[in-house]
């Protein structure tokens, strides 16, 4: 093999090794930042209807209130690049199916890029006045780490994600059937209207 070709091959091999090393370091960093917590999973509820959350005004809400309904549960943020598209499509779905037993439960979260920095009242004003949301908005929560709210411990236990259970970004979505089973989990980049067919299928189920 000519010396120049051998040099090119060695250089390409070196780049590949560096890239693989970079991926490995990035993956380890991700696991370190958002580790799974066995003790937290053990403490999670056996039913979504046994869990209580707080609404945007700080009042306790038992999720048993939503028994028999199809739920789309979303961690939301007001200043994300995904915000406008998601709220627009969630509004479409809610208007279309709310009378058929469909609910969207939106949980503000500031853990991703600090894109939900406001107080609960500021969030409520933004969501209701700018994004025109009519579905329930709840108290700002954490979805990863030691302060993860019980609901998200339960959701992640029921439906793990790619490369670990941690929520990866704003607007991750969980779909819950009428019996309270977490039937699917969707990436933040999955638009609400892409989920419509799955929602319709669950609404048609007894």
Curated annotation (Swiss-Prot):
GO BP, sorted A to Z: abscisic acid-activated signaling pathway; cellular response to water deprivation; response to hydrogen peroxide
Transit peptide, from-to: 1-12
Example of a GO cellular component annotation carried by this entry: endosome
Annotated control of activity: The redox states are modulated by H(2)O(2).
Disruption phenotype: Leaves of plants lacking GPX3 are 1 degree Celsius lower than normal plants, whereas leaves from plants over-expressing GPX3 are 1.2 degrees Celsius higher, probably because of the impaired evapotranspiration.
Its EC number(s): 1.11.1.9
Keyword Transit peptide part of the UniProt annotation: yes
Protein induction: By osmotic stress, H(2)O(2), drought stress, and metals. Regulated by abscisic acid (ABA); down-regulated by 1 mM ABA, whereas induced by 60 uM ABA.
Catalytic function, reaction form: 2 glutathione + H2O2 = glutathione disulfide + 2 H2O
InterPro entries linked to this entry: Glutathione_peroxidase (IPR000889), GPX_AS (IPR029759), GPX_CS (IPR029760), Thioredoxin-like_sf (IPR036249), Thioredoxin_domain (IPR013766)
Keyword vocabulary terms for this entry: Abscisic acid signaling pathway, Mitochondrion, Oxidoreductase, Peroxidase, Stress response, Transit peptide
Name of the top EC class for this enzyme: oxidoreductase
PROSITE patterns recorded: GLUTATHIONE_PEROXID_1 (PS00460), GLUTATHIONE_PEROXID_2 (PS00763), GLUTATHIONE_PEROXID_3 (PS51355)
Parts of the chain that traverse the membrane: none
Molecular function in Gene Ontology: glutathione peroxidase activity
Keyword Transit peptide included in the entry's annotation: yes
UniProt subunit comment: Interacts with ABI1 and ABI2.
Family membership: Belongs to the glutathione peroxidase family.
Function: May constitute a glutathione peroxidase-like protective system against oxidative stresses. Involved positively in abscisic acid (ABA) signaling pathway that regulates numerous ABA responses, such as stomatal closure, seed germination and inhibition of vegetative growth. Oxidizes and represses target proteins (e.g. the phosphatase activity of ABI1 and ABI2) when oxidized by H(2)O(2), probably after ABA signaling. Modulates the calcium channel activity in guard cells in response to ABA or H(2)O(2). Confers tolerance to drought stress, by enhancing the ABA-dependent stomatal closure.
Other remarks in the entry: The reduced form of ABI2 is converted to the oxidized form by the addition of oxidized GPX3.
Entry protein name: Probable glutathione peroxidase 3, mitochondrial
Gene behind the chain: GPX3
């Amino acid at each position: 093999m000519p010396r120049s070709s051998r040099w090119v091959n060695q250089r390409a091999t070196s780049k590949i090794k560096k890239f693989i090393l970079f991926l490995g370091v990035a993956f380890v960093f991700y696991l370190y930042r958002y580790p799974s917590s066995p003790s937290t999973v053990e403490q999670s509820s056996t039913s979504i209807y046994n869990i209580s959350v707080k609404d945007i005004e700080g009042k306790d809400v038992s999720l048993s209130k939503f028994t028999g309904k199809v739920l789309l549960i979303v961690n939301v943020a007001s200043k994300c690049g995904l915000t406008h598209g998601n709220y627009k499509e969630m509004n479409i779905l809610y208007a279309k199916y709310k009378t058929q037993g469909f609910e969207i439960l939106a949980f503000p979260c500031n853990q991703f890029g600090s894109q939900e920095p406001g107080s609960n009242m500021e969030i409520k004003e933004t969501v209701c006045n700018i994004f025109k949301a009519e579905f329930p908005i709840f108290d700002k929560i954490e979805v990863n780490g030691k302060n993860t709210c019980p609901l998200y411990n339960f959701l992640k236990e029921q439906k793990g994600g790619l490369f670990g259970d941690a929520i990866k970004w704003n607007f991750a979505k969980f779909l819950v059937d009428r019996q309270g089973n977490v039937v699917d989990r969707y990436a933040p980049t999955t638009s609400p209207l892409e989920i419509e067919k799955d929602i319709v299928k669950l609404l048609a189920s007894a």
